[in-house]
Amino acid sequence: MKIIVFGNGLVGSQLAAHLVAAGHDATALGRDHGIDTTTGQGLAATLVGAEVAVDLTNSPSWADDDVLAFFTSSTEHLLAAEREAGVRHHVILSIVGADRLPASGYLRAKVAQERAVEAGGVPYSIVRSAQFFEFVPGIADAGTVEGVVHATSAHLQPIASRDVVAHLAEVVTGPPLDGVVEVAGPEPLGVDTLVRRLFAITGDPREVRTDRHAGYLGAELEDTSLGPAPGSGAWLAPTTYDRWLAEAPR
């Protein structure tokens, strides 16, 4: 099966390698390959003969208007090129709870992306993932003010990127869902707890201060904001945060 993965970062590179190991013709591409999803540059040639396209692209800017423009234009150009090429399955990676936190401009843009995919005329699957363990250091840095990390105690249900890749590969190689599937880690944990456990392993000396008003993706969280929806039948990954911390390279 020929599969084109748009986005060659943390998930895209792993996904392509996983698919190749399983015997598929899979390639992860980014701007360094002459691809620009916001303009359509390079898409037609890239999609020749492809059966599946996976959109893992992300906006280079976090400004609300820029993020919305990125996901809107990228999705429009990708779907148009896929329709022309006869692609039979369009897969995107979205975020668990994106539709429950409208105060976040980034998440509003992800919802707009989902809606465009649903109306795009290509059979599709939307995989909503919880936050990745790998992004906890970035969350800590974003919440640091004068050497103190401000982190909410509201829960996420984060997941190892390798587990996301394993389940994403099953979706990519299966029939289109024409719907949404959610994936998350095995346990809900407060953002402050995630950072403290990370620092206990890495020896980071920064104080972690619990702050219920600390922002996350531009909004305040409640415990139910970014966890799997009740009754969603979310797939729960096997890797715990503590196991991931123990195994992560230093």
Model-derived features: positions:
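Pocket-edge positions in alpha/beta enzyme catalytic cores
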Residues: 35-38, 63-67, 156, 186, ...
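Short, amphipathic alpha-helical "lid/cap" segments that border enzyme active or binding sites
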Residues: 44-47, 79, 161-169, 238-246
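NAD(P)H-binding glycine-rich loop region in Rossmannoid oxidoreductase-like domains
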Residues: 17, 21-85, 96-102
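Oxidoreductase cofactor-interface core, primarily capturing Rossmann-like NAD(P)-dependent enzymes
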Residues: 3-6, 10-25, 85-88, 99-207, ...
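A short acidic, often aromatic-flanked loop/helix-cap motif at beta-alpha or helix-coil junctions
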Residues: 34-35, 42-44, 133-134, 189, ...
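Active-site beta-alpha turn of Rossmann-fold NAD(P)-dependent dehydrogenases/reductases
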Residues: 57, 91-94, 128-130
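Mobile cap/lid helix-loop segments that border enzyme active or cofactor-binding sites
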Residues: 188, 195-250
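Actinobacteria-biased recognition of intrinsically disordered, low-complexity terminal regions
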Residues: 1-4, 17-24, 30, 41, ...
